[in-house]
Amino acid sequence: MSRKPPKKSDMGKSWMKPRRDSRQMISPEYHLIVSEGTKTEPTYFEKIKETIDAKYRDRIHLDISGKGDNTVNLFNRAVKDVARSNNVYKHVWLVFDKDDFPAENFDHTVELCEAESTEETRYHPIWSNQCIELWFLLHFMFLQSDLHRDEYWPKLTECLKSRNLGIYYKNRTDMFDVLRPYMDDAIRNAKMLEEINTGRTPSKSAPGTMVHYLIRTLKPYL
């Protein structure tokens, strides 16, 4: 039996139009985390990546890269990585410490991130003054004293031991899991420091850290 062609009067009606496949694939949002350190920071963020990948791999994708470089050089290497990558990174997070690097380089890196940012790719300067261990310590306490980076280790160990969580040592692989229950406290304490440091350059914001911006962005997936 031959099939009759549709009537002209029926053409254009909604029930005559082909159905669209509602199962359209949505590409995940790509993030690149580039750190100055090659072990402590990548280990911490790799654990975050594992946690996110377990449930949200199709919604957000993290690439982690520890460069072993600092401030301006770290920024330049991140820009090159973005240009060479097949992925279109929506967010590029530069994680770096003040340590003993010149103040002008530290502050200039923040300025470079702002200047390089576009609607397509946003560069975020996730600095800590003096070091990322400040972010770790803020999970347990609010700290306003400007300590040398070497003084954070014993303080972290004291806080960890008081909670039967062992001691702190560089490149401890379970730091994210250990700190995770106190994440909201760390975010609150970091925001308080940011308010105190209002009007100061990053190099003068001691202590201070921007890690909470990255964690707050990823928190819905953790």
Over which residues does each language-model region extend?
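C-terminal accessory helical subdomains adjacent to catalytic cores in phosphodiester-
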Residues: 1-30, 42, 46-65, 81-93, ...
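Short hydrophobic beta-strand that contains or immediately precedes a catalytic carboxylate
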Residues: 33-36
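Short polar catalytic/cofactor-binding loops
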Residues: 39
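Short phosphate-binding loop-to-helix
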Residues: 67-77
